[in-house]
């Protein structure tokens, strides 16, 4: 099994969610996140004072799925989240050893 974590721009969430549904993914976890990379921050003026905003708002999308579905999901996320500008985000892929559904005790792919 694979865990795919994608850090994307918040306004791209609906497009990513729809793309994941189109490739047959049934569940996702979404978390608000803040961060910066090459995009860095920017300065804002608030009540006459200039502030540096280091961390930019992002959204983290997480999915766990069968190995054979990983490439389709990665492509769906990449195509839906891409704007071609700095700050589009990152996709991280890692192996998952086990999944357990708390309610039933099911394990492995049955628990996803």
From Swiss-Prot:
Q: Which domain of life is it from?
A: Bacteria
Q: Can you list the GO cellular component terms from the UniProt entry?
A: cytosol
Gene Ontology terms for molecular function: ATP binding; enzyme regulator activity
Print the keywords alphabetically: Nitrogen fixation, Nucleotide-binding, Phosphoprotein, Transcription, Transcription regulation
Name positions with the PTM O-UMP-tyrosine: 51
Q: Which GO terms describe its biological process?
A: nitrogen fixation; regulation of nitrogen utilization
One Pfam family named in its UniProt record: P-II
- Report whether Nucleotide-binding shows up as a keyword of the record: yes
Subunit composition and interactions:
Homotrimer.
Q: Which family does it belong to?
A: Belongs to the P(II) protein family.
Q: Which function does this protein serve?
A: In nitrogen-limiting conditions, when the ratio of Gln to 2-ketoglutarate decreases, P-II is uridylylated to P-II-UMP. P-II-UMP allows the deadenylation of glutamine synthetase (GS), thus activating the enzyme. Conversely, in nitrogen excess P-II is deuridylated and promotes the adenylation of GS. P-II indirectly controls the transcription of the GS gene (glnA). P-II prevents NR-II-catalyzed conversion of NR-I to NR-I-phosphate, the transcriptional activator of glnA. When P-II is uridylylated to P-II-UMP, these events are reversed.
Descriptive protein name: Nitrogen regulatory protein P-II
- What is the originating organism of this protein? Rhizobium meliloti (strain 1021) (Ensifer meliloti)
Which gene underlies this protein?
glnB
